[in-house]
Amino acid sequence: MFWQRKDLLGLRYLTPEEINLILDTAVPMKEIIGRKIKKTPTLRGRSMVTLFYENSTRTRSSFDLAGKFLSADTVGLTASSSSVAKGESLRDTGLTLTAMGVDVVVMRHPASGAAEYLAKCIPAAVINAGDGTHEHPTQALLDMFTIREKKGSMAGLKVVIVGDILHSRVARSNIWGLTKMGAEVRVVGPITLMPKDIEKMGVKVYHRLEDALEGADVVNVLRIQLERQQQGLFPSLREYSRLYGINQKRLELTASDAIILHPGPMNRGVEIEHQVAYGNRSFINEQVTNGVAVRMALLYLLTGGEYHALSN
């Protein structure tokens, strides 16, 4: 199979075959990361700009390293350090970058749909690095890559997503991707942090954590955004932790070989207990490594690379 899309905007409209192509391509990319010399000339002469309108540590540095490991020329821009601070529109920013010859724009933006809008405005490939509460496709892909590495096929797995589902673009992308791959997705959290009609996305909804964890194969713990407490969406961090924090006792409800994931950054002692976060069932640090591999795969595919050329 060959990659045929100009952009990666979300997982909602990707096919299972396209998802597998990305994950398959990430396998040899991870091998590159494990080398002493982490460099391949694959994207020499190609250029990538990271355009971030929101703060980021993991996603931005991950894309930057992904580009560098493939020998692409990379430039990082933030809203505060660019003409955006002077009032330049997103469209004009994109057209300016295109005029400079950029091949790929990786963008994070607070507005849902911003990546899709930019993709319609410019000929360069656009990768959505998070748009509002809409999607965060590369985070979901690295989560799925980690699950596939540890569990094999995702079909039939019971995957629990815990936390603020309402505001989480990570949750949405994971739901779209995992359900396409045949997983049983369970979402659990306070009723005030659960979207209405989320069952229509093909998930099972729980409000009691213990029920959701019963027999789970994967537990993906979302970061609780502290500002939600100020908005009155849950009483206190202590109360949230009491009801929805992942601790050793609750972990015993899951399958004996269940794995723990977290997109980071963690609020240790709130959504996840220290011993669980650093226990032998946690693959949180490996998710970070896998994120670089998945983003390398996407840069390769979106610039015309073919998987079979890597596997030969």
UniProtKB/Swiss-Prot annotation:
Stored Pfam families: OTCace, OTCace_N
Entry keyword Secreted: no
Binding site residues for L-aspartate: 86, 169, 223
EC number(s) given by UniProt: 2.1.3.2
Transmembrane segments: none
Native source species: Desulforamulus reducens (strain ATCC BAA-1160 / DSM 100696 / MI-1)
Lineage: Bacteria, Bacillati, Bacillota, Clostridia, Eubacteriales
Entry GO terms, CC: cytosol
Protein name as catalogued: Aspartate carbamoyltransferase catalytic subunit
Keyword Thylakoid: no
Source superkingdom: Bacteria
